[in-house]
Regions:
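Conserved small/polar residues in nucleotide/adenosyl-binding loops
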Residues: 1-4
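Short hydrophobic-aromatic micro-motifs
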Residues: 74-87, 131-141, 145-146, 164-167, ...
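ATP/nucleoside-binding phosphotransfer catalytic cores, i.e., glycine-rich phosphate-binding loops
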Residues: 125, 131, 157, 167-260
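Gly/Ser/Thr-rich active-site loops/lids in small-molecule metabolic enzymes
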Residues: 96-104, 153-175
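Catalytic core of DAGKc-family lipid kinases
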Residues: 23-139
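Glycine-rich beta-strand-to-loop/alpha-helix junction loops that act as flexible
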Residues: 8-10, 35
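Short Gly/Thr/Asp-enriched flexible loops that form oxyanion-binding sites at enzyme active sites
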Residues: 13-26
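Short glycine-/acidic-enriched loop or helix-start segments at secondary-structure transitions
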Residues: 16-18, 42-43, 148-149, 177
Length: 260
C-alpha cells in the first residue's frame, strides 16, 4: 500500500505534522485539508476552500515540492515571527476562535496596539547585516499572514529556496508608526523604517530572550537563532492552478505520481 499522511485543521495542525515528518527526515507525501480560522498556508497555495474539493485534490496525487524552514532545532512551514501581535494566534481564546473565526484574532490584536515592546537585535545574512531596536520581525514563505495578503511583499515564490525577511524598527513618534502601517498595507518598500530582503539563511541575536511564534504556535524564547531554508523539503499534494497564480507563487514543477 502507498504510504502518505493526510491531515485536516489549521496552520498549527499542519505545522505539527510537518515537524514530525522533518524530525524523521522523511519524504512521505502530505495531503492537507484546510479547516482552520485563517489558513494562511493553504490560501498562499490557492488550495480549495471546500473540504470535499481538497480531498479530491489529494486523490489526484500531484506533488508540489515546497520549501520548509529550520529554526534552530525546530521546523516551521511558512512563518517564524516575533514582536507586535505575533502572540495573538496562540493567546486568543480557542472558544472565541471557534465562534468568530478570523475576527477573534483582530479583536485580540487591537488590545495590543498601545503596548508596543521593542527588542535590540542584530540581523545577519549574506544580503544584509543590521543592528537596531525592532518591534516586529518575520521570516516567511507565504503570500498571506494573519489572513492579510501581500504583507510579505511581491513576487513570493514558495519553492525558490529563499525566505522573505521583514524587520520593522521601533517608531519614534505616531507619524513614523503611520508610515510603517501604510508601507505594510500597500506592500510598498518606501520607508527606511522597514528592512525587507530575501535570504536562504538568517542569524538573529538579541540582548534578552525574545518570544517567537512558529506557524501561529509558541516557539519558545531565544537570544540567538539560526533560520535556514530547506529547499523543496516538503512533498505536498497540490493541484495545478491558473497560470497567473502559478507564476506568482512559483508552483513548478508539479509531478503526477501516477505517471512515474
Amino acid at each position: 500500500y502507498k504510504r502518505q499522511i493526510v491531515c485536516s485543521g489549521g496552520d498549527g495542525t499542519l505545522d505539527e505534522v510537518v515537524t514530525g515528518v522533518m524530525e524523521k527526515k522523511s519524504s512521505i507525501p502530505i495531503g492537507y485539508i484546510p479547516a482552520g480560522s485563517t489558513n494562511d498556508f493553504a490560501n498562499s497555495l490557492f488550495m480549495p476552500k471546500s473540504m470535499t474539493d481538497a480531498a479530491s485534490m489529494i486523490m489526484e496525487e500531484k506533488l508540489y515540492h515546497c520549501d520548509i524552514g529550520r529554526f534552530n532545532n525546530q521546523s516551521f512551514t511558512y512563518i517564524a515571527a516575533f514582536g507586535l501581535f505575533t502572540d495573538v494566534a496562540y493567546q486568543t481564546d480557542q472558544d472565541l476562535k471557534n465562534i468568530l473565526g478570523h475576527v477573534a484574532y483582530l479583536l485580540e490584536g487591537v488590545k495590543r496596539l498601545f503596548d508596543i515592546k521593542s527588542y535590540h537585535m542584530r540581523i545577519e545574512s549574506e544580503e544584509l547585516t543590521v543592528e537596531d531596536d525592532f518591534i516586529f520581525g518575520m521570516i516567511t514563505n507565504s503570500r498571506s499572514v494573519g489572513g492579510f495578503k501581500n504583507l510579505t511583499g511581491k513576487n513570493v515564490d514558495m519553492n525558490d529556496g529563499l525566505f522573505e525577511v521583514t524587520m520593522i524598527t521601533r517608531p519614534k513618534n505616531p507619524l513614523e508608526l503611520q508610515e510603517i502601517m501604510t508601507a505594510m498595507l500597500t506592500a510598498e518598500d518606501n520607508t527606511d523604517l522597514i528592512h525587507s530582503f530575501k535570504s536562504a539563511r538568517v542569524t538573529i541575536t538579541s540582548e534578552e530572550p525574545v518570544p517567537w511564534t512558529l506557524d501561529g504556535e509558541y516557539g519558545g524564547s531565544h537570544t540567538q537563532i539560526e533560520i535556514e531554508n530547506c529547499h523543496e523539503a516538503l512533498n505536498l499534494y497540490l493541484k495545478s492552478t491558473k497560470n497567473e497564480e502559478t507564476r506568482s507563487i512559483g508552483i513548478s514543477p508539479l509531478i503526477n505520481k501516477k505517471e512515474k
